[in-house]
Each structure stands twice: as C-alpha cells, then as structure tokens.
Design a protein with these regions (language model features):
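Active-site glycine-rich loops that stabilize anionic/oxyanionic intermediates
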Residues: 1-2, 69, 157
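Catalytic nucleophile-loop/oxyanion-hole region of alpha/beta-hydrolase
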Residues: 3-13, 24-60, 210-212
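A fold-wide structural signal in alpha/beta-hydrolase
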Residues: 17-27, 64, 182
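Primarily recognizes the serine-hydrolase "nucleophile elbow" in alpha/beta-hydrolase
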Residues: 44-119, 132-136, 140
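Acidic catalytic loop of the alpha/beta-hydrolase fold
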Residues: 112, 158-162
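Conserved serine/cysteine hydrolase catalytic core
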Residues: 140-148
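Short beta-strand/loop motif that positions the catalytic acidic residue
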Residues: 147, 152-155, 159
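C-terminal catalytic histidine-bearing segment of alpha/beta-hydrolase fold enzymes
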Residues: 168-228
Length: 228
C-alpha cells in the first residue's frame, strides 16, 4: 500500500499472456490514499472485466486475481468477505458479483497480528493503524469462509519483510474453512522476488535472482488449468 511495483506488473502479465491467458494490470491507489480506495478500485476493475467479457474474450466464471506482498492483501480482501460491506455501501457494487473465481498470492501480507508487516497497515489505515478492531478486520486469516475461492500461494522461508508465517496462517485458515489451497514454500529468497529471474531483478540486484523460485509461474499455470 506504499507503492505499486513495475517489477511485479508487466513482466508477470507477459508471462501469463504467453501461457495463453488474458491479463489485466491494475495500478491501484496507494498512500496517502487510505482504505477503502484501493479495494473499491479493485472491485470496479473486476466489474469492468466481467461487463466486457464477451468483447475481451474472457470467461466471466474463470477470472483469477493475483497479488504480490501488500497487493496480495488487496487481492485477498477482494476474494474474501472482509470488505463486502464497504464494496456494497461505498462502491455501489454487489460484492459477490466482483469476487474472483481464484486467488493467487505471492509472498502476501495476510495478518495484522504478531507477524504483521506493520508498514502495510500504516499505509492502509493511516492514523487508525493502531485501532484493534480494524486490525482484526484486516487480518485475512480471520475471514476465510465458504465464499473464499480456491487459493494458490507461494512464499520463501527466508522472507525478512513479510514473514512466512503470513502464508502459514493462511494455509491453516483455509484448511479450517474447507477452502482449497495449493501452497509452495521455497527454502531461500528475499522479499519481492517477482519472477525471481534476471528480467525482474532490477538494477543488478542479484539477490532477486533465485533459481529454485523461478518455477512458480509454471506451477500456477498448472493449478489454473486443473481448476478451470
């Protein structure tokens, strides 16, 4: 919620385009905008895609959303029931009509609890970032339910920005709620890897080139094709 990353946008979209998927990139509002601005933008993007499904050659019942880091929190917010009331009341949109059919997450921010990435919630909530009721509301693991679509998630065990416990808590919550989830935990790699290759490393930052992680788009493709 501090920024949107070029490294996690077009290069990833082109990977999935090459695999035969229609792709869209949302540049949502970040700080100083606060909740629910980004969520309403995501909901409107989903509404627009489904409204133009025939023209854009999209199956409206096979729309997945993919988010990285704090963008993963936004994607999960849209996919779960966390923001339903805000989407309905402030966006004038039926939340069930814009819920994705699949949720894909890369090193996502999930919890606002012990293992939170505090900066994300500071950007999301501003001076309300210490409001415990809001922190509970935006802890995604507390809101996984029957409306949550199937989930694909990956994380690295050595992520020093968004702890892997975020994904572990998501796995536990999905299991408890009976939500299908495929999870991949890689042994090494810093936060923000994107495709984990030279294309997305940026400025010679070789720590973002991690060979064992580079398979995740193929794993995600296989998951999507099994699902749809």
């Amino acid at each position: 919620y501090a920024m949107t990353s070029d490294r996690e946008a077009e290069p990833v979209a082109l990977q999935f385009l090459a695999k035969g998927f229609a792709v869209f990139v949302l540049r949502y509002s970040v700080q100083p905008s606060r909740y629910p601005v980004a969520l309403l933008e995501a909901a409107e993007a989903m509404r627009l895609i489904r409204a133009n499904a025939d023209q854009w050659h999209v199956n409206p019942a096979q729309v997945a959303v993919l988010g990285f880091s704090a963008g993963g929190h936004l994607a999960a917010n849209l996919a779960t029931s966390v923001g339903d009331e805000d989407i309905r009341e402030q966006g004038g949109i039926d939340p069930d009509a814009v819920r994705p059919n699949a949720l894909m997450l890369s090193y996502p921010v999930i919890t606002a609890g012990k293992y939170a990435h505090r900066g994300s919630f500071q950007c999301l909530l501003g001076d309300q970032a210490h409001n415990q009721a809001l922190l509970d509301k935006f802890s995604i693991e507390k809101h996984i339910d029957a409306k949550t679509p199937p989930v694909f998630v990956w994380h690295t065990m050595t992520d020093d920005a968004v702890p892997v416990e975020n994904t572990l808590m998501l796995i536990q919550a999905c299991r408890a709620a009976g939500v299908s989830i495929e999870a991949h935990l890689f042994p090494e790699g810093s936060h923000g890897l994107s495709l984990a290759n030279a294309e997305t490393a940026g400025n010679g930052f070789y720590a973002h080139i991690v060979e064992c992680v580079q398979c995740w788009p193929d794993l995600a493709e296989a998951w999507l094709r099994r699902l749809f």
